[in-house]
């Protein structure tokens, strides 16, 4: 089940703070820093990014990705 609680997405028992960016220029580290700050330690920070005429990409820390695989 997926639920949206304010800026927090809850899916499969895990909470994610999703930061969406739609821009031609993209700084992954700056976007991740913003997501980490906004998540405030209560959720896994995730950044979604899209450029014009390109598919969406998802950026997350490796340690968080590996935890999802467990």
Language-model region placement:
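Domain-level recognition of nuclease-like catalytic cores that cleave nucleotide substrates
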Residues: 44-70
């Amino acid at each position: 089940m997926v639920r949206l609680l304010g800026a927090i997405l809850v899916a499969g028992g895990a909470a994610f703070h999703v930061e969406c960016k739609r821009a031609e220029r993209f700084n992954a580290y700056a976007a991740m820093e913003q997501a980490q700050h906004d998540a405030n330690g209560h959720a896994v920070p995730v950044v979604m990014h899209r450029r014009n005429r390109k598919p969406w990409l998802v950026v997350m820390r490796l340690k968080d990705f590996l935890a999802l695989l467990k």
